[in-house]
């Protein structure tokens, strides 16, 4: 079993914001684990870990809950994403 990446992103395959978040992370050249929440148990795990948030994507860097795509892109615009990723 491969070790978990520092970054986890909870997604569905039909979510445009999930695709945008993955594209931003891909552009940064960072590895991440994608967790498909069409599995009901994984969705419940996401909701619990994200303190009740039910929308996707939900992004975690280490143990820090970043939030969704808007939150991730706001960190990028403010120059605060790269330090979290390093």
Q: Model-derived features: where do they sit?
A:
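A general structural signal for well-ordered alpha-helical segments in protein cores
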Residues: 43, 53-56, 78
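Short alpha-helical
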Residues: 16, 41, 54, 67
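Thiol-based oxidoreductase modules, predominantly thioredoxin-like and allied folds used
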Residues: 31-43
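Local sequence-structure signature of Cys/Sec-based thiol-disulfide redox active-site neighborhoods
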Residues: 2-31
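A broad structural signal for alpha-helix termini and local helix breaks/kinks
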Residues: 50-51, 85
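Structural micro-motif
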Residues: 51-59, 70
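Non-catalytic, surface beta->alpha helical segment in thiol-disulfide oxidoreductase systems
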Residues: 61-86
